[in-house]
Amino acid sequence: MVGESLTKEKITMKKDTKLRDDQFELYDLTVVVESISGNCTCNMKVGDKFHLKGGKLSMPDKSDFCLYALQSTLPLLPAKQRKNHPADWMETDARVVCPDPECKLIMRIDRDNLRVLNHDDVSPIKWEK
C-alpha cells in the first residue's frame, strides 16, 4: 500500500570503507510498477521497471515506460539515492503514484547497491579541498 516503509536492512546499510574527501555514496535505484487498479492507457504492467545508477537511467531489455509515470518519480530520485537522517520521510516512504487519476498506478522505489563516486568523474568543476 501507499506509505508502507522500506525494510530496516535497506535503510541501515553502512559504508564498508573510509571515503576520501572527494568521494560520496549513492544508492542505485530500481523503480518498479507495484500495482495498477485503473485503466492504464500506456499499457504499463505490474513489474515494469527502470533503473537509476549514478546519473544514468536505463530500462531492461529495451522496454518502454510511461513518460507521465516516470516524471512523477524524477523529483524524488536524487534524495532517494542519498542516505538521509533515519527520521526523514525519504527513508521510510517508497511509493509514488502516476499523475493520471484514472490509471491508479503505484510504483515503488527500491534502493539497491551502494556505490562510491568520485567528484571529478561526475562534475566538470574540479574538486578543491
Where are these regions (language model features)?
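Helix-coil modules at protein/domain termini and other flexible surface or pore-lining loops
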Residues: D22-E25, G55, V96-D100
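Short, compact, well-ordered microdomains
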Residues: N84-E128
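Short, basic/aromatic beta-hairpin or loop at an interaction surface
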Residues: K18-V31
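Short alpha-helix capping/helix-loop boundary micro-motifs
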Residues: E34-N39
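Structural beta-strand/beta-sheet cores of well-ordered domains, especially the beta-sheet scaffolds
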Residues: Y27-L29, D48, L105
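Acidic, aromatic-enriched beta-alpha/helix-loop junctions
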Residues: D48-D88
